[in-house]
Regions:
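Extracellular jelly-roll beta-sandwich "head" domains, especially the C-terminal globular C1q domain
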Residues: 1-175
Length: 175
């Protein structure tokens, strides 16, 4: 177990004596544990996934599958489905970033169990454009969150080595 000692502002705490360079010092210190309990460490849930290739002419309500998984703590993100399934009840943060090239646009929904919880639009008549959406949602274990193309609006999600379209999420607080 790691320990961390902090100088106390009030000297009601235990007095601690230590020696530095052959001089004896007495200070008022208190102990703050820095180690999570086993139940807290089991609640580390986070993921980050990118698109490995462009999505051209996605269909109506097509799920966007972020197949290049960079991080998957807790195993909640399923690349073959393109969705995150909550392993535990909690408050989660989700973010989706999308880019489109000039004269193209795309509208994506962030969806929880078939209900939209966020929306992002990227596109311009001339310039490349990127946009993102971040939201917080309370999930019950087994709830699914994914990114879906909106209806028939938009036609291209652009990908190259400088543009990372991503879907990320993290557990903020277990409940």
């Amino acid at each position: 177990m790691f320990k961390y000692f902090v100088k106390s502002q009030d000297c009601q705490a235990d007095m601690t004596t230590f020696i530095i360079d052959d001089h004896t010092h007495t200070q008022c210190l208190y102990y703050v544990p820095l180690v999570f309990s086993s139940t807290e460490t089991a609640n580390h849930v986070a993921f980050k996934a990118h698109l490995s290739q462009a999505v051209i002419s996605p269909g109506e309500n097509q799920r966007i599958v972020y197949d290049d998984v960079q991080l998957n703590l807790g195993g909640g993100y399923h690349a073959h489905l393109g969705g995150f399934v909550a392993p535990i009840n909690g408050t989660y943060l989700f973010s989706v970033a999308v880019c489109s090239i000039g004269n193209h646009y795309i509208v994506l929904y962030l969806v929880k169990n078939d209900v939209m919880i966020g929306r992002v639009l990227a596109g311009d008549t001339v310039y490349n454009d990127c946009s993102s959406e971040t939201t917080i949602s309370e999930l019950t274990a087994g709830d699914e969150v994914f990114v879906q193309h909106h209806s028939t609006v938009g036609d291209l999600i652009h990908v190259n080595e400088n543009i990372l379209n991503s879907f990320t999420g993290a557990l903020l607080q277990a409940i």
